[in-house]
Amino acid sequence: MLDIRLFRNEPVTVKSKIELRGDDSKVVDEILELDEQRRKLISATEEMKARRNKVSEEIALKKRNKENADDVIAEMRTLGDDIKEKDSQLNEIDNKMTGILCRIPNLISDDVPQGESDEDNVEVKKWGTPREFSFEPKAHWDIVEELKMADFDRAAKVSGARFVYLTNEGAQLERALMNYMITKHTTQHGYTEMMVPQLVNADTMYGTGQLPKFEEDLFKVEKEGLYTIPTAEVPLTNFYRNEIIQPGVLPEKFTGQSACFRSEAGSAGRDTRGLIRLHQFDKVEMVRFEQPEDSWNALEEMTTNAEAILEELGLPYRRVILCTGDIGFSASKTYDLEVWLPSYNDYKEISSCSNCTDFQARRANIRFKRDKAAKPELAHTLNGSGLAVGRTFAAIVENYQNEDGTVTIPEALVPFMGGKTQISKPVK
């Protein structure tokens, strides 16, 4: 959520930033109008309360002097009713303002390129060279079924489209990837490992910006009023919701693996085969809490943490900065890492790393103190995929496939695969 002072002091800037996303900036005028009404109501209410205090003194004085106080008592009752009415009006305006503010996205950083869609994202780095095959490479969805690593048909029977059973060495590879990523982030990148709740309440979803605007993208357990998480970013960021982080704690760096659940509303017809776009998938997440002046350097570091995984696995990738028309709701700036997939003859997103500045912290009331005597300030929150496990799985299977149908295990993963260096079709 944005600071109301930005609307008061820099309305033109806020309007232009909203328009860069392709959104309607008239909400700024709506907020300013409501804010003016609110301030007038507060002023009027304070005047009434001051008069009520004065009348209370007059009543007491008249009673001490044994004078008739009926007139001032009547005024006191009228003032009480008027104050109650003003408070009700103020509460209504507050609810209207919050209802609008909570749907306004974060302000985009000045260095984010302008554009309308992912086609306008700007490549800033490329690593590795896509492999040239001496044979016709297969798509990962064909490879995993031939090697008995996955079963899409039985998953469809059990759960519907966009689900998968990972079987045999497919399940082992998925587990190995999660263990490898978590180990890398905790032992080399300084993150604290967390196991997170995968069902959360509405306040938690509100804190990170999924609610109320993106409810259609979520799965909800209606009876309990809980939501399945679309990413571990949600519970990790809300760890400090409604708390003041004590001096000396920041920077705080969490990592955790979880299943992620997404309805993929609006994705009909896209990536219908394989592991790229599922309703349920595994992901390793990185979340950071930073002092405001440190968050931009933290974004660069977090992105290189994700890149280190891809490089150690030997997977060609590129880094792009998302344009104004493609960046997420809560982010001020986002880097996407895109891995090379031979089946697409293109790069596909495998990680997003974002600086959300104080946007989520204001929604979730996450504050910190620089020292014991200091006034609490809003922290900056960052999140990044480190990485999307299923897409990493697909990238390994496609980029490390062999002509005989086997798949070579990247060297970095061998210890996590029990020493196994190759995946072959099971004998049975």
From Swiss-Prot:
Q: Which domain of life is it from?
A: Bacteria
- Residues annotated to bind L-serine: T231, A232, E233, E285, S385
Q: Which Pfam families match?
A: Seryl_tRNA_N, tRNA-synt_2b
The UniProt entry's coiled-coil ranges are none
Q: Could you give one GO CC term from the UniProt record?
A: cytoplasm
Q: Which reaction does it catalyse?
A: tRNA(Ser) + L-serine + ATP = L-seryl-tRNA(Ser) + AMP + diphosphate + H(+); tRNA(Sec) + L-serine + ATP = L-seryl-tRNA(Sec) + AMP + diphosphate + H(+)
| Keywords for this protein | Aminoacyl-tRNA synthetase, ATP-binding, Cytoplasm, Ligase, Nucleotide-binding, Protein biosynthesis
Protein biosynthesis keyword on record: yes
Q: Name one GO molecular function term.
A: catalytic activity, acting on a protein
- EC class (word): ligase
UniProt subcellular location: Cytoplasm
Similarity section: Belongs to the class-II aminoacyl-tRNA synthetase family. Type-1 seryl-tRNA synthetase subfamily.
Q: Which PANTHER family would you find in this protein's record? A: SERINE--TRNA LIGASE (PTHR43697:SF1), SERYL-TRNA SYNTHETASE (PTHR43697)
The text the record gives for the protein's domains is: Consists of two distinct domains, a catalytic core and a N-terminal extension that is involved in tRNA binding.
This protein is called Serine--tRNA ligase
Q: Which organism is it from?
A: Staphylococcus aureus (strain MSSA476)
